[in-house]
Amino acid sequence: MAVTYRTPMEDIVNCFEPATQAVIANSAATLYKNFEEQHCQYFNYYLSPLAKRKLSMAGIYLSPYSAVVHSHPVCKTLENYILYSVLPSYINSSFYFVGIKERKLQLLKSKCKNLDSVQVVNRYVTSADRMRYTNDFVPYGSYEHECLVHKGVGLDNEALRGLVGPLRRHKAKNLFFHDELHYWSSKVLIDFLDVMRPDKLLGTVVYPPELLFKPTRSLNEWCYTYDIVGDTLMFFPDGVQSEGYQQPLKGGYLLGARSLKLPDGTVYMVDVLCSKFPHHLISITKGEAAAPTHRAFGPFEAVASEALKATLSPDYPCAFPVSYEVVNKIYRYLRTLKKPDEQSAIAKLSQIIAEPSGREIDFVECFARLVIHNSSMCATIMPEQLKEFMGNWLGKMPSVLARRFSSVRAVCVNKFIRGLKPYSFTLRLNEITWWNIWENSYAWFFDTDAEVDVPEKLDSLFMGEGAGLVAHITSRPYVGTVPLADREWNALLCMDSQKLLHAMRRMFMRGAWGAHMCVISREFLLKYVEARLKSSCLIAKARRRGQHKEKLEAWEVLGLKSSDALFRAMTYLCNARLEPMFSESGLRFFLTRGRNNLYGLTNYTEGKRAVTGVQNLWSNVVHEVSTKRHKGMIRLEKARVTEQPRSEFASCVLEPEVWRDVEAALDIELGEVACACNARFVQGVVLSNQAGLNVREQVAGASVGLYTKDRSNLKWGNSELLSNGWGRSLSVWMEINSVSQKFDVAVRLSYSKETQMNVLLPSLDGIERGAGATVVNLRKCGAFIVRCARGWRLALAWMDHICLEVMANVAYGHECYMRSWGTMDVVVFLKRATVSEQVTFESAQEVGPIEGKSDSGAPGVGVNLDLGGVVGSEYPANGAERYKRVSGPGDGCCCWHSFAYLVGMHHMELKRLCTSHVFENAALNVELEQCKASGAFVTHAAILATALRLRAEIRVHNAGTGRVHRFAPKQKNMALDLWLESEHYEPQVLRNGCVIESVAQALGTRNADILAVVEERCCEEVVESVQAGLGLNLHHVEIVLQCFDIVGHCNLGDKEITLNAGGKMPFCFDISDEHMSFCGRRKDPICKLVSGALHGKMFAESALLDLENCGLKIDFEPNWNRAGMLADSMYQGATGVLGSALFNNKRNMREKFVRNVSLSLHAIVGTFGSGKSTLFKNLLKYGAGKSLDFVSPRRALAEDFKRTVGMNERGGRAKAGQENWRVTTLETFLARVEFLTEGQVVILDEMQLYPPGYFDLVVSMLKVDVRLFLVGDPAQSDYDSEKDRLVLGAMEENMSVVLGAREYNYKVRSHRFLNCNFIGRLPCEINKDDCTIDEPHIMRMHLENLLDVAEEYKSVVLVSSFDEKMVVCAHLPEAKVLTFGESTGLTFMHGTIYISAVSERTNERRWITALRRFRFNLCFVNCSGMDYQQLAGRYKGRVRSKFLCKTAIPDDLNSMLPGQALFKSEYPRLIGKDEGVREEKLAGDPWLKTMINLYQAPEVEIAEEPEVVMQEEWFRTHLPRDELESVRAQWVHKILAKEYREVRMGDMVSEQFTHDHTKQLGAKQLTNAAERFETIYPRHRASDTVTFLMAVKKRLSFSNPGKEKGNLFHAASYGKALLSEFLKRVPLKPNHNVRFMEEALWNFEEKKLSKSAATIENHSGRSCRDWPTDVAQIFSKSQLCTKFDNRFRVAKAAQSIVCFQHAVLCRFAPYMRYIEMKVHEVLPKNYYIHSGKGLEELDAWVKKGKFDRICTESDYEAFDASQDEFIMAFELELMKYLRLPSDLIEDYKFIKTSLGSKLGNFAIMRFSGEASTFLFNTLANMLFTFMRYNIRGDEFICFAGDDMCASRRLQPTKKFAHFLDKLKLKAKVQFVQFVNKPTFCGWHLCPDGIYKKPQLVLERMCIAKEMNNLSNCIDNYAIEVAYAYKLGEKAVNRMDEEEVAAFYNCVRIIVRNKHLIRSDVKQVFEVL
């Protein structure tokens, strides 16, 4: 497939011979030359790249040589385009130009020769015109034209004043206005056309077209901007404020006009001939003709926002000012990311736009957030119609509400993307007529529908259906201006003043006046009326007579004569409606029937809050005030009665006439009534009926309650009444109701209407009858009947609570009865002795008799009392056997314990809740306050508060009385039963209440709640069965389930049934042995109802296969003996506590063994921090709703895992999607094993910490197959418990059973540690690139220094035993102190390890566990009595010693691991190689992420090549023994003093040679400080200023871009010749290779991403677009210069490194690799480029080349700085030859010629760090060699950058000598005999192969030993020595004495330290 499309003509031309192509090109060049000559002067302004692209796409020619600067080049180019390219095709010599400069007209005439006779008419309109036109301009002056008189002031306009006369004199019919029409209003234009009547009028208009739909900001900011100031527009060309000018906002009306209609009906058509952004060419032609009805504008640099309307703020414009390309790219980019984020979106924006605007940044941030948090929606194929419907429907709501719905957001995003395109709009054109000139303001300041014809709409609304019959108004000319001047002025709106006055009065009465405003201010009233009139613009407030205008006063507007009349008219109604204040009324307030000012007189809270006490008191006042009084009427009737003794309790039946008297008494008023016997009865008002007196006993059909002040009992006939004391509230109540305080006995009576009772109680003993009595009626309706012994009777009644005071003289000889239609409820006060106070119920009110059911269901009779909002009653108890009591503690809180047991709360919390209740009655609050004390007994007030707070019906079964006390609130949710015996409460539950309990467990609520619902909703039969405690049949069970909408899946053992199948909530129950239990979520999978069901909670098979591939598959067969031993230990309480029979009443788990067949499980093992848990955490990211059990041996590990995956802590509600995730400990999980579902995932984490036999126990109890994973590190702490050590200690460990005889992969690389110091100290692999710090660990001595360590190290302390834990806790009480074993699986940032003498006895696994816990660093506190050196010796060979000595290797784990472990660095992957890896690595560099392809690596099957097994020649090599010191003695004298070797610059001195020993821990001192091996070579450091300046001076060359571009231009002609010379030796193929390009791109990105994520993030600043591409940063390379030539030398210049912007590298690097592949594709066999190849390939090539003669080497001086313009010309021709993109070549030219830094601009040269450095250096080296020497073709030549070596003596040639002299590149030729060891890249070349110079290797190994770094680099040194070692005697024979001695010492060091070697090279040095 072609990279770019070519037209057929292009293909044909490319097929021609070059000569033919040149002929065609000449013709095209001539055409282009002529075109450029014509247009260059108009379109040669310097433009930005964006402006170039926009203008070119708009069809505007731009000169390729655009260098002329201008303040606003874009708008100037557009103006020239309209004026010089578009306009000439529409005009001729007949046109008159108006408002144009002479210079522009002359340019136009020079371009168009037919415009020579065009004349210009200019005039002064603005002050700037005086300077705009030339000095020879003469303004016209003339007499006023008659047309001006005809138009009156119409043509007296600045634009027309000096224009009409000259044009009429010239009889101009064709006109052109230059940039002027946008200043004219539509009226001015119509007046002008009406006077001039031109045939054609052309004009240029500058007006932003987007203003037609009213955005306040420009949508083409690259071209222009504008501001709206009032009704004017400030237009800024190119956004340059200083070049802006002001014009009318309405100036664009012609863009929306179709025609113009003059007063006489003449029509002018309007057309837009050309529209380019804000510049338009408009044509106005005379005569009506066909024309379009709509006009379109666009596209703009914006996208429509209509689709996102529901998510936007109301003031957001109709378009987003962001280009379509930006939105499109960012959306597609975010959708391709696996983990999109806002940073990536902003980085992508910076990549697309170098300098984005603030509006673009804001939009991208918000848009990215919207896209990221809302998934895409299908609306085309398989549309999500429900989601779309909900989104559209909810989107109709206000945006502030709509955007909160996810469906609305998803639909909005979908609509936005589906309709995404550059914003444009279509405008409906209108006709501008002379009579409806709106000045174009209508379109701007009002919203109008483009499809509505406003005049027709108004006509239809005004005329109704007959609007169509009315002829439209036709236009006609004016007939003169006289009527306009003489016509009388009339108001447009007339209003009746009388109606206006009425309206004003109503407004005043309702809004300003109040019913209690006694005085009205005259001034206030007048100001009020004036303000109201002023606010209306439709009411005439002035009188006009001719030219005189007179202001009207307010009263004149209202039709009144004076202000007094206004005041009277406004206030005459106020006095009639005035209401007196309460303070003014006094007592009259209570007597008047009219009520006003009643706010606050209700007995309920009117405000938001009110204090309860105030509310209660106020309700009493309200009751008192609201009592009605009527005039009384007393009826006395004498009756004949026989004198006979009567008993008080004798039946007293009132005659019908007496009842009539009672009924009549309902209308009488209270008063003092006298009997015929002079007995007096005084009636009074009961202000409060809340007596607070209860009835306790039954006497002769009445409920009686006795209250005495002295607490004495009284006799009533044969019965003794027990005194209830005398509460303080009773005295208060008596005082409120005006009952005399002399009474000290109160009797509460409650009886039915059938019972007749003399309320004066003559049978009550101990009463002083002469003291009189007071009887209080507590009922609202009733009547007192008084019988006199003389035969008189009185009927005294009242409609409300009354009291009757019987005077002392009527105590004898009278009877008093109470009659009512309901229950009688009275209180009788009598005189006796003083009685003491006792707290009782103080707010009881009888509410009626009980006619309900008792416990047994039999009818019971009792009395209901309203006790503070709770109805209290009492009835006989029956059926106590239906309940079972639960024993409770008798600690004084037994009642609270009972309540707490029934409701499931803590008793103290429940007590605090209930005792905090506030009653309406103060006495109850006092009594409740006493219950708050600790150990206080519960009173009735506490029970009432509990009933109210819990909304519970409380039934107290009193064992002493055999009755049930019932307390029921008005709203109840549950029923609670208590047993009271001997002042001790116990909770009662129904016998056989398993149904209630099962339903409660299923719904997660309390039994009491379920019971209350059952009693309320179920039928009587079910309720009786429940209350009887006899159990329920299945039919009744189904009825109960129906109440809660539960589908009950019931397992009956032999069968399964479903109850209430129509319910909504399915639950499983088990019914066996007449007992029902809830199965919960742990459904038994054996149950047929769920067995085999596809429950949809299984993980995807692909995800599990990937996971299983990371571990070892094991067919595990459970051992019932091992499982049984662990089960017995747990049953006995030796192992754990949850499975104990003693502590938790558990059964032995042996009974649950059901499985003896094998189960496939997978073991995933790896070292600490290897990512084992991360595998499952990643799995859970896609496990929403899936079933998983994660088991941890430690509670801390379980909680840590919960926090990591985002699960709630214990007791919290599970998040959506996590309902089926269970994180448990090992004991809790055993209770779930038998209920696991088939196929679910079970993970046993930290498998080495489980007790022996645990895996056998789990598998033995499994009823179904599950996906079981064992995860852990067998090398860490194992299980150990002192309690079961004797029982389980003899059993084999779990790890040995599972892995003992198997070979398995063990991941040895750890990702936990971020400190380089841990490398070599821990037995694992640590990637150095992952480490971000390099800090040594801290070592402290003695316990007292524990307090001195840094705070971060004090947070966690690890100890080896529990005894040490106590010691550390005493010193650091705030620290988290853990034993080594307890810390297993946990990770900390910093911490401390405490070492004591006991620590020595800790096994290796626990030591490994402790040392691996800390990511950053750790501190040791040594309290063992030994120093650290002694400690290392004492622990020799152990993990602790290897940590201190830095000698740990992964092989140390072999002794701790069971079976045969195969160490691997990574877990294997099955499918999707590298998926998401790139994106994760680039998380810290969002800018680079936009430059890198994020696709995954292709799956390529690697072909296995057969390995050739050859018998290598081997024999022993005898090396002469030579000590290291004797080797050193041969050259030590060559080391000069430091002061002679360093370089001085001013007062600065270089620092390249060391003279001190290193302070690195573990370093070895091989020599004295001044003669260290490191001193042999210079060391360059980035901090060495002198070394850096030396590098700048030697290796960099500076120039300026202009000079370098000129040099390159002159050198470009040599490029093709150089390339042809190169192609003679290396015949490159020019065709494009797609595979090479893909591989090159992939290889570059892989190399770029091979660094760690931390390193990439640290260099993210290089990716930001704020770093200019043509600016680089210069560094000096930090390195030890270990070339052989650098031994014993003085200081040398550093190697400079240039740091480029990442965009530059990503631009060029893939193509450089592509060129390299093209070179390697055709490279001859005898040429070798050492790039991307190993030493084995070099060795094999050298053997083929037979380097056995005189060889040629080239040594270049300043090679990089010598890569001048001639070499670059060769590079450019090479890129063109390989058909690389031309824009890439231009970018390469730009970078090479324009690159600069803080030091200045560079000349053309090569830089280290440039993408093409090595490749082009090598190619330049090859080209120079081909031109410098006579190459025959059979030479073997190897190249690598600036290094070259040929196998023969190459003869120089003079053929290109003249050209080579021009090059900066110079070479020193060396001819080396093979015995003198020719060198290439530091390797000696010989016929037998390659080998490294031994002195270099030895000295570098000694330097590593001095730095304690040998373990990190010995592999590399061993590889270098191995080539000479394998050559044996062949290499020794070519070495001199010094080299042999060095070679021996190299081999000796390697053999002694071969245990540090990690690679296979170790085998070379092992003895066969």
UniProtKB/Swiss-Prot annotation:
Positions annotated to bind ATP: 1166-1173
The record's catalysed reaction(s) read:
RNA(n) + a ribonucleoside 5'-triphosphate = RNA(n+1) + diphosphate; ATP + H2O = ADP + phosphate + H(+)
- Which residues are responsible for catalysis? 994, 1075
Provide the RdRp catalytic domain boundaries. Answer: 1749-1856
Tell me where in this chain the OTU domain is found: 883-991
Domain of life according to the entry: Viruses
Q: Which residues form the Alphavirus-like MT domain?
A: 63-254
Q: What is this protein called?
A: RNA replication polyprotein
Q: Which Pfam families match?
A: Peptidase_C23, RdRP_2, Viral_helicase1, Vmethyltransf
Q: Which UniProt keywords apply?
A: ATP-binding, Dioxygenase, Helicase, Hydrolase, Methyltransferase, Multifunctional enzyme, Nucleotide-binding, Nucleotidyltransferase, Oxidoreductase, Protease, RNA-directed RNA polymerase, Thiol protease, Transferase, Viral RNA replication
Q: Which GO terms describe its biological process?
A: DNA-templated transcription; methylation; mRNA modification; proteolysis; RNA processing; viral RNA genome replication
Origin organism lineage: Viruses, Riboviria, Orthornavirae, Kitrinoviricota, Alsuviricetes
In its UniProt entry, the species of origin is given as: Potato virus M (strain Russian) (PVM)
Mention one GO molecular function. Answer: RNA binding
Start and end of every (+)RNA virus helicase C-terminal domain?
1317-1454
